[in-house]
Amino acid sequence: VDIGIRFNPNTDAKTIKQISTGKKDNKFGVDEKTFIQLVSKLKKSKFINLKCLSVHIGSQITDHKPYEKMIKAVDKIIKKTKFKFDYVDLGGGMGISYEKNQKELDYLKYSKVIEKFVKQHDTKIIFEPGRSIIGDTAVLVSKVIYLKESYSKTFVILDVAMNDMMRPALYGAKHQILPVSKIKTKKSSNYEFVGPICETTDKFLSSKNFQKLNEGDLIFLCDVGAYGSSLSSNYNLRPKSPEILINKSKIKVLKKRQRLENII
């Protein structure tokens, strides 16, 4: 049987705490000592072929330096084991810009880190760049169903909720919200965009500089291509949203809106 072992390099990805996966107190992978012991045992096995070293330090990483530290740890462990891996899976985590003016990963610096490693090790490299490919390919379109004035803010209650886009409620991720129709109008003083679910965490964004909205207006929740649909659920007995593919002038329905009878 061909297998791989996931190594925990004890590297801080400098990302959202809940999606950091490469520190020693995270549940993923094995530490250096255990990894070396496993490789030593598997070298002698007649039935198990160790093929791959795998590592993944987290998601939504926007700085090349954590990758640099991770690569140094991988290089060190390979030299310590003196084992020739057919594959080294360097994971993913390459971040995108979710907020206006948010820093993005410098791919030139990232590639130089990888290039240096490749020159030292004759092995095939595997990457998992999911978010960086599809993250900005989708938007969630929502309608304003109610405006609720409350103390010092206005709640903009949308017809989408945390069941449709879980990231903000799950770990405080920020997604830009834009009006579908931009008009010159008075800016809001304090909008809080929320869903209609019975959870305080059913909140998307607070904005102090948004165009004035009315019931029935449409907004975009941006960059939902990664972990949007895959994290969606029927929580609160809410049917899942439809998914539509737009390719230039062509429109294709990928998933129809769920009906209540499909859930029950």
Regions found by a protein language model. Name each.
Residues 1-87, 96, 113:
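Active-site-proximal beta-alpha core segment in soluble small-molecule metabolic enzymes
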Residues 6-10, 93, 161, 196:
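Generic beta-structure capping elements
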Residues 1, 76-79, 83-85, 105-120, ...:
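Acidic/histidine-enriched ion/cofactor-binding microenvironments in catalytic or ligand-binding pockets
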Residues 113, 122-264:
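Charged (often Lys/Glu-rich) extended helix/loop segments that serve as interaction or gating elements
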Residues 58, 93, 224:
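Flexible loop residues that form catalytic
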Residues 31-38, 49, 63-73, 86, ...:
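General structural feature for long, well-ordered alpha-helical segments within catalytic domains
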Residues 13-20, 64-66, 98-103, 136-140, ...:
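Short acidic, glycine/serine/threonine-rich loops at helix termini
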